[in-house]
């Protein structure tokens, strides 16, 4: 993956608040969007997805476009995020997996040895052509709203492949990491290649920013993260740097890893709800923007409680800016919960924009 990709000219969106905040410029208003904003919280999403499997949906460009647009139309958020799933590039490459309702991704043949790693198929851009087509449809429809592309980080993809599905303790993943570092690094190197190819395909198609989701990194100690994960995430960010778009790095439960995650090369570090943004800024260090960090569960507590927490978070974000953070993008500290009232999200957008 040493050959640098080339990217066609993309949309010029000088006034987009999200891009301004991510790039260290002064936005016209505080930008806000939500992880998992296109999803089960929206009745129009549930209707259009009825009877259609998750992975099938992710490879239908017109459907991806419509689902991605739904929260932009409804909530007035400052960014769209491509409707997809972190295992899409694995499926596209030919790995036998499915997304099982109520469980998540399930892998038919878990990876447990160096031979298993060697047998993994490599992703080529043509295999995610449907995703690229969806990006092109979206950039034609979004107007001045930026489109965020995304991928799963090598560690999180590795956990799914090693465990065979979601895991509470990641015991097989950690066992492989510690008992057979050679196989571990070979696996993450292969998955970094997959992630890079997937992101480059989205960037060539015209996404305006990218986010790397390391959903399970919070299961690691700082020492484990630095030794077994950071070099591979660094390579992902380095390989897409030439696209010159904002790069966001996010993981759940990663308060103790924020400094190292900031070192990986992103322009923006996502923060979950467990740590105040001004504290996060000190851990990340100056020169990075921050994204976050309302607890998704607070949206069930009523408008007064939401407003109280939003005012706290924006004050902490302003303190982070004073301490050297280069921008703030308001978001939740994790994805929108399925039973969230869509009206609460719309009201949250209006509140953030009013402050």
From Swiss-Prot:
Signal sequence, renumbered to the chain: none
EC number(s) recorded for this UniProt protein: 4.1.1.37
Gene Ontology molecular function, alphabetical: uroporphyrinogen decarboxylase activity
InterPro entries, per the entry: UROD/MetE-like_sf, Uroporphyrinogen_deCO2ase_HemE, Uroporphyrinogen_deCOase
Associated pathway: Porphyrin-containing compound metabolism; protoporphyrin-IX biosynthesis; coproporphyrinogen-III from 5-aminolevulinate: step 4/4
Localization per Swiss-Prot or TrEMBL: Cytoplasm
Organism domain of life: Bacteria
PROSITE patterns per record: UROD_1 (PS00906), UROD_2 (PS00907)
Protein name: Uroporphyrinogen decarboxylase
Organism of origin: Rhodococcus opacus (strain B4)
